Swiss-Prot record:
It comes from the Bacteria. Its EC number is 4.2.1.-. PANTHER family: D-GLUTAMATE CYCLASE, MITOCHONDRIAL. It comes from Rhodopseudomonas palustris (strain BisB5). GO terms for molecular function: lyase activity. This is Putative hydro-lyase RPD_1846. It holds the Pfam family D-Glu_cyclase. Keywords: Lyase. Disulfide bonds: none annotated.
Length: 272
């Protein structure tokens, strides 16, 4: 039985955690958007890079903890990250991947077995899906879950702090909320800094460079009612944007909205 530093224990394979069931479904090609699945378990964004670029990317994440909070990292060439889950294989356990060459998206496979190399390092970055459980528990509605679509995500004019070849704008996710719910959401998500924490912006999307909120750069659009405000959180798709801008010769990421579901518990991420 594996124990990770917070003291949480993973169940044995026979007991089959809901998170492990999701990963098995991914291996079988039967999974899609992970919003709302395996309640209680931490989800993560994925970035896989050659070892040559790993140190600079790690530094980028350290300098930009809001969009890029690292929750796990593999050894060089090892597709498993035991601290994140039982029998977890980073090559097969997400619903869909993106493969990049020289900054260009070339493929979106359901596994990356054929692309795996001995020099690759995998980074798992915290995902806002993890704090959504806490919002729902406080009766704060989440539009993309209600509509069973991917959360809308946007590139902004908020610059990230550069590191090595990695630089570019922050990507944000958006959830429309009534003002009272937005205030409560700030309070709730502030407790979860390892999965983006409090919002980075509320209202006035044009002021952070979003020209048309009805057309997200990633994910799916959701309606905003007249009595609602768009609330924006730093997003773990930011690494995809900076990896593409850096034109790294080879990289693998998750497809936006289709995350790695780990065996870590959301409740263990709260700082208060």
């Amino acid at each position: 039985m594996t124990v990770f530093p917070a003291g949480q224990q993973f169940q044995t394979e026979g007991e089959c955690l809901p998170s492990y069931q999701v990963r098995l479904a991914c291996r079988a090609g039967q999974a899609d958007t992970t919003a709302g699945v395996a309640p209680g378990f931490v989800q993560g964004n994925l970035a896989i890079l050659p070892e040559k670029y790993a140190a600079a990317f790690h530094r980028f994440c350290q300098l930009n903890p809001k969009p890029c909070p690292i929750i796990g990292m593999s050894d060089v060439g090892n597709p498993q990250i035991p601290a994140l889950g039982l029998d977890l294989d980073i090559r097969t356990d997400l619903p869909r991947y993106r493969v990049w060459r020289d900054g260009e998206l070339i493929e979106e496979p359901t596994d990356v077995m054929a692309h795996w190399r001995d020099d690759l390092v995998a980074f798992v970055v915290g995902c806002s899906f993890s704090f959504e459980e806490a919002l729902l528990a406080d009766d704060i509605p989440i539009r993309h879950i209600e509509r069973k679509v991917r959360v809308p995500m946007y590139r902004t004019n908020i610059a990230c702090t550069p590191a090595g070849p990695f630089a570019g704008p922050m990507v944000v996710s958006m959830r429309p909320l009534k003002p009272a719910d937005a205030i409560r959401a700030v309070q709730i998500t502030s407790r979860f800094p390892s999965v983006h924490g409090a919002p980075v912006h509320i209202g006035l999307p044009q002021s952070i460079g979003i020209a048309d909120i009805a057309n997200p750069d990633y994910g799916d659009p959701v309606p905003i009612a007249p009595d609602e405000l768009p609330v924006f959180w730093a997003c773990g798709v930011t690494p995809q944007a900076v990896i593409a801008a850096a034109k790294v010769p080879f990289a693998i990421t998750h497809a936006p909205g289709l995350m790695l579901v780990t065996d870590l518990k959301n409740k263990h991420l709260a700082v208060l």
